[in-house]
Design a protein with these regions (language model features):
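ATP-binding pocket architecture of kinase catalytic cores
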Residues: 51-157, 163, 169-173, 197-198
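Juxta-kinase regulatory segment immediately upstream of eukaryotic protein kinase catalytic domains
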Residues: 16-33
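Active-site acidic catalytic loop and adjacent metal/ATP-binding pocket
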Residues: 47-54, 63, 140, 189-239, ...
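Long, amphipathic alpha-helical stalk/connector segments used for oligomerization, subunit docking
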Residues: 269, 275-286
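Active-site activation/catalytic loop segments of kinase-like enzymes and analogous catalytic loops
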Residues: 165-172, 237-275
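Short, positively charged and aromatic/hydrophobic N-terminal segments
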Residues: 4-9, 13-15
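An alpha-helical support segment within catalytic cores of ATP-dependent transferases
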Residues: 23, 29, 145-151, 155-156, ...
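ATP-binding glycine-rich phosphate-binding loop
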Residues: 36-51
């Protein structure tokens, strides 16, 4: 993954500075009397960047910079509306200029689930965090409808599976698979595809893990805050659970993740979601997806 990021093209510095200047002018046009500072907040594995706006009265906002033609903020806006209407806590859109790729958003803070977990919270707090995360996921899944988001179809799944031979085997390891090895891999991929595509389908965040879940301050907050959902699709119901419990950034004992999975399955059945009636079948789907 990090090797892939390292190959992403870097925009020339003068273009980045020009974009930042345009953002500053845009903010001033909306609130000429409001003094503020603008500072980088984060970036992801794309041309998209984020800035935190701190106003002189102490309030903060976040600006998404999604420069056309490299980025399109409209998919993000569509998913924001879908997930927000479902009751999930997503950033509020305060202003938008889709032609230039600027969005002014509410600020969900700096505390990701990852940073909260790295502080080694008590077991009860960890259990609450993951309970909140699965509750939010169930809200999103209950709102699912076909034909609204792109389908997580065979072509997309296969394209992601092919990252393994292309990026890991060939680029990272510097190896070339023999014809016999490739045939074995292709057979394995077909088994995986059959299992994944046979699952019940729901809205899928696609990056539902500890770096994209925000821990919000204050009592009664609708945790977690959910970000980075622009690539959401309609696909296998176990996908986001695998992202959450088999997180690339946080490692858990299998006994722990199995307990969380059972709790999710019980809540999902009560919510009327199309999970398998038998937990063993559901767990098998989850493992095939993993």
């Amino acid at each position: 993954f990090h090797s892939i990021i390292g190959l992403l093209p870097d925009a020339p510095n003068d273009i980045l500075m020009e974009r930042q200047s345009q953002i500053t002018d845009w903010l001033r046009q909306m609130a000429p009397a409001a003094g503020f500072t603008l500072a980088p907040a984060s970036a992801d594995a794309s041309f998209r960047r984020y800035f935190r706006v701190t106003y002189h009265d102490g309030q903060t906002r976040v600006v998404m910079d999604a420069p056309p033609p490299h980025e399109d903020c409209r998919p993000w806006l569509k998913v924001q509306q879908l997930f927000g209407a479902a009751g999930a806590h997503v950033p509020e859109v305060l202003a938008q200029d889709t032609e230039r790729g600027f969005l002014l958003l509410s600020d969900l803070g700096n505390t990701t689930y990852l940073s909260a977990l790295q502080a080694n919270p008590p077991e009860a707090e960890t259990r609450r965090l993951y309970g909140d995360a699965t509750d939010a996921l169930i809200k999103i899944q209950k709102a699912s409808q076909p034909g609204i988001l792109p389908e997580y179809d065979r072509a997309l799944l296969l394209r992601e599976l092919m990252l393994f031979p292309e990026w890991y085997v060939e680029r990272h390891l510097g190896k070339v698979l023999s014809e016999a090895q490739r045939q074995v891999m292709d057979q394995a991929f077909e088994r995986i595809l059959a299992a994944n595509l046979g699952e019940p389908q729901v809205f899928v965040h696609r990056d539902y893990h500890a770096r994209n879940l925000m821990l919000l301050d204050g009592c009664g907050q609708n945790n977690p805050g959910i970000i980075d959902f622009q690539d959401a699709v309609y696909g296998p119901i176990s996908y986001d659970l695998v992202s959450l419990f088999k997180d690339a950034y946080v490692e858990w004992e299998e006994e722990q993740t199995l307990d969380w999975l059972v709790r999710y399955w019980e809540k999902a059945r009560r919510a009327g979601l199309p999970v398998r009636a038998d937990f063993g079948d559901f767990h098998r789907d989850y493992e095939w997806m993993g």
